[in-house]
Amino acid sequence: MASAGGGDCEGAGPEADRPHQRPFLIGVSGGTASGKSTVCEKIMELLGQNEVDHRQRKLVILSQDRFYKVLTAEQKAKALKGQYNFDHPDAFDNDLMHRTLKNIVEGKTVEVPTYDFVTHSRLAETTVVYPADVVLFEGILVFYSQEIRDMFHLRLFVDTDSDVRLSRRVLRDVQRGRDLEQILTQYTTFVKPAFEEFCLPTKKYADVIIPRGVDNMVAINLIVQHIQDILNGDICKWHRAGANGRSHKRTFPEPGEHPAVLASGKRSHLESSSRPH
């Protein structure tokens, strides 16, 4: 068992060292290799989080990838050949995911599984995630299940060009020891169709859509400001807005596009109006 202090799980410190609390839960979705984890890491960096002194952390990052189901021998054989669909909703242990998130929202310390992408198996080792003020939960299908989707106080969707996502996916899977031909076959057979059928339709549930992911620093900075408001005790305004039926939904435009219309009806210039050559 390991305490959260690196990788995609960042802990906030032992419960004995901090008061019991109910975290503000943020869902971060988007297609494969869209930059979800990078966006989360940038948010953590801008909030001044430190990988060494994890006891002082107020923000946790948790990946949906940790909740892949334990495969049968037949399924594992298919996975090793690139013939198993890891982008389908049924590939995830949604019951365990829901229970874990429920405990996190209740301010409890939880143990999350560790998944090995080389052997396609869940390891015996778990990671301890301590209570935090803000929890970022990222994954391709975190908005697919209504039961899980409704748990988020804020929903972000990272919207990245499909060609960019494919190139990132290839590089990532090659680094995981995968064969290039197998990667491309899996992408065209499973990944792309699953994105169009299961992931992309959930974009409509996002409160904030972030074009170009971490490259869109205007969007990232505004989101960080909202999180800072929460950390500073201004979380109530979000709950009040939700109770009054007001939507937080907004899309951060590309350079050269018209500025987004905010919930208040006012227009706000979020990026430069000139597109770089």
Swiss-Prot record:
Keyword match Phosphoprotein: yes
Pathway(s) the chain acts in: Pyrimidine metabolism; CTP biosynthesis via salvage pathway; CTP from cytidine: step 1/3; Pyrimidine metabolism; UMP biosynthesis via salvage pathway; UMP from uridine: step 1/1
Residues given in the record as ATP binding sites: G30, G31, T32, A33, S34, G35, K36, S37, T38, D215
Record keyword Isomerase present: no
Alphabetically ordered keywords of this record: ATP-binding, Kinase, Nucleotide-binding, Phosphoprotein, Transferase
Gene3D superfamilies in UniProt: P-loop containing nucleotide triphosphate hydrolases
NCBIfam families membership: PRK05480.1, udk
Family the entry assigns: Belongs to the uridine kinase family.
Protein name, entry field: Uridine-cytidine kinase 1
Organism: Bos taurus
Gene (name only): UCK1
